[in-house]
């Protein structure tokens, strides 16, 4: 449903920002 899609998109956004933070911290390019 729509709610599930919203949850999926939200989770995707959170995961993406976490990945970005992690890779930027690892490479030291924050």
UniProtKB/Swiss-Prot annotation:
Tissue specificity annotation: Expressed by the skin glands.
Keywords from the UniProt entry: Antimicrobial, Disulfide bond, Secreted
One of the record's GO cellular component terms: extracellular region
GO annotation terms (biological process): defense response
Subcellular location: Secreted
Cysteines engaged in disulfide bonds, as pairs: 24-30
Protein name stated in the entry: Brevinin-2Rg
Species this chain originates from: Pelophylax ridibundus
Lineage: Eukaryota, Metazoa, Chordata, Craniata, Vertebrata
């Amino acid at each position: 449903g729509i709610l599930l899609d919203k949850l999926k998109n939200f989770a995707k956004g959170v995961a993406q920002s976490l990945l970005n933070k992690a890779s930027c911290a690892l490479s030291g390019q924050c």
